[in-house]
UniProtKB/Swiss-Prot annotation:
This is Phosphatidylglycerol--prolipoprotein diacylglyceryl transferase. GO terms for molecular function: phosphatidylglycerol-prolipoprotein diacylglyceryl transferase activity. One of its GO terms (cellular component) is plasma membrane. The keyword Transferase applies. Pathway: Protein modification; lipoprotein biosynthesis (diacylglyceryl transfer). It comes from Bacteroides thetaiotaomicron (strain ATCC 29148 / DSM 2079 / JCM 5827 / CCUG 10774 / NCTC 10582 / VPI-5482 / E50). It is an enzyme of class 2 (transferase). It is found in: Cell inner membrane. The keyword Transmembrane applies. Keywords: Cell inner membrane, Cell membrane, Membrane, Transferase, Transmembrane, Transmembrane helix. Its EC number is 2.5.1.145. The chain crosses the membrane at residues 26-46, 59-79, 110-130, 136-156, 189-209, 219-239, 252-272.
């Protein structure tokens, strides 16, 4: 049987609509929806733990810029340092959302290339700075962020799906997607696999928070978030297309190697860190 008949042809217009010459894209909208849900969830936890809400206001400023800067630097340094570190123009393109044109001048492109591992590191550093300023315990804050992270990650992967990016390897499974903007081969919808996995983790987090948060030690939610997401990320990479050509000859690709430290850290915080104490309520 022709596997194309069993595949889902995928070629959505990434632009939702155009408003006064400004392109509103699914990618940005889904990112915004994910951040909105995280905002609601973390705000609820602040109120539940009776933390001064004045300390909540600057939190998402730190989170946004920590993730953005970390994700951008992570992509440039981990995946394509030759492009961004060998010329002045490349260095500027790493820092600013522009691209220099061959004939001169430049154009606004947004940040083309963001790495989740770098975003995670950037977020952790930003939260450390936030906690120094607000005098909140670092692990209490990262636990709250961890509860909300999976739903944001889910919407980010749906955004990748709408952009037909981070595609999977060719396959003949009946739920394969044909990403027509790339080629006509049926492929694993890796973005959808990740989105579903993160949605499941989100429901697990909410269940544990509502029913067991007073019994779980400080750092548990942070550890579970890291261990679950990056363990899944490690294994899903086997059915995803490598992002850069240099990864083709590696036993494990860059995403898998970068996931290993986060997995180890995650299990440490789940099973060994501060087990005799429960999180501040």
């Amino acid at each position: 049987m022709n596997t194309l008949l069993l595949s889902i042809n995928w070629n959505p217009n990434p632009e939702l609509f155009n408003l006064f010459g400004i392109s509103i894209r699914y990618y940005g909208l889904l990112w915004a929806v994910g951040i909105f849900f995280a905002y609601i969830i973390v705000h609820y936890q602040f109120r539940d733990k009776k933390i001064d809400e004045k300390k909540f206001d600057p939190l998402f400023f730190y989170c946004f810029f920590g993730i953005l800067i970390g994700a951008r630097l992570g992509h440039c340094l981990f995946y394509d340092p030759g492009q961004y570190l060998t010329s002045g123009k490349g260095f500027v393109e790493m820092l600013l959302p522009i691209k220099f044109l061959a004939g001169g001048g430049w154009k606004f492109t947004g940040y083309e290339g963001l790495a989740s591992h770098g975003g995670t590191l950037g977020l952790m550093i930003a939260l450390w700075l936030y906690c120094r300023k607000t005098k909140l315990h670092y692990m209490d804050v990262v636990d709250m962020i961890a509860v909300a992270t999976p739903i944001t990650a889910c919407f980010i992967r749906l955004a990748n799906l709408m952009n037909s990016e981070i595609i999977g390897n060719p396959t003949n499974v009946p739920w394969a997607f044909v990403f027509e903007r790339v080629d006509m081969l049926p492929r694993h919808p890796g973005q959808l696999y990740e989105a579903i996995a993160y949605l499941i983790l989100f429901f697990i987090m909410i269940y544990l928070y509502k029913n067991y948060s007073k019994k779980l030690h400080r750092g548990f939610f942070f550890g579970l978030c890291l261990a679950y997401i990056f363990t899944f990320r490690f294994f899903i990479e086997f059915v995803k297309q490598n992002q850069e050509a240099f990864e083709d000859n590696m036993m494990f690709n860059m995403g898998q190697w970068l996931s290993v430290p986060f997995i180890i850290i995650g299990f440490y915080f789940m099973f060994f860190y501060d087990r005799k104490k429960v999180a501040k309520k």
